Amino acid sequence: MNRRRGKIDEKLFLDSEMKGISLIKGGNDYDYCVRLFLDDLELKNLAFHTRRWHRENLHHFKQMLLKLNLPTEPINIAEGNIKQCILHWKRESNLSPTTINHRIRSMKQMYNFLSNEGIVNQIPIAKVEKLKSPQVIIRPFEESEIHGLLRQPDKSSFIGYRDYTIMLVLLDTGVRLIELENMQLSNIDFNDNKILVMGKGAKEREVMFQGTTRLYLQRYLRLRGSLDHDYLWINIMGTKLNRNSVQDRLRFYGKQANLKGVRVSPHTFRHTCAKMYIMRGGDILSLQKLLGHSSLEMVRHYVDLWGSDLQQMHKKFSPVESLFRNG
């Protein structure tokens, strides 16, 4: 029987790694590499939906490689193989540039991880650029449209009252859908009218609400009652309300209100919150913090979008016009 040495020779590890043992085990198995990458994202505490998003993107890449009879082993995939996948999606599948770019982004992140771990020696996607995509402009709600939406929920029922309150929270705080979905009862501070939410990149931030939203939130909590979990938004069974249900309910109210030319979604509420905040004199620095943007780029984009509205606002509140009008 071969006995293990009493003392470990660390050179054994170094020699094995230099000879590429990890390349043989991992680099030849696409699914194994994806699993390692997703595990690393989990260790970095990235949200479940983010990990699922990457998994789906990487799955689509593998399926296309198989369809085109191209190598699927990460150590054998070449830059040309990746470009073939992209061209097929663009020409044959007619996918949007945004969807294709999402897949490119996931593949790049996985290869960067594999390279850092020594599982691959080259990053074939390193020089592959994202596709140019048209900027999608999300039209905010007009005030009349907001009133139309708020008239739809039946506030005499639990579902209607919950949905009405959700719309107020979306409009008042500008939170993302995932942030709304994961709101915790214990993170609401009614003394200072704020809610602690978990934003992108597992970054916490506080969002604010005011008197009307506070009133409906407190009443909703009485309807919600005491449960064995801390999630704020629930369905009639008392379990956590999922994001698909929120989106479906909002679309339903949009149809009931007969809204045309505007997407009725949580993200439209977010854009509407941003616009109304700016139009009522809010500054972009505080808006950036409230919305959880990592830079001012997106907030500046909001201002650019609503230039004509700002012109009307300046016409109404011009310092010089006001001075001479009152003088």
Region locations from a protein language model:
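Conserved catalytic core of the tyrosine transesterase superfamily
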Residues: 1-327
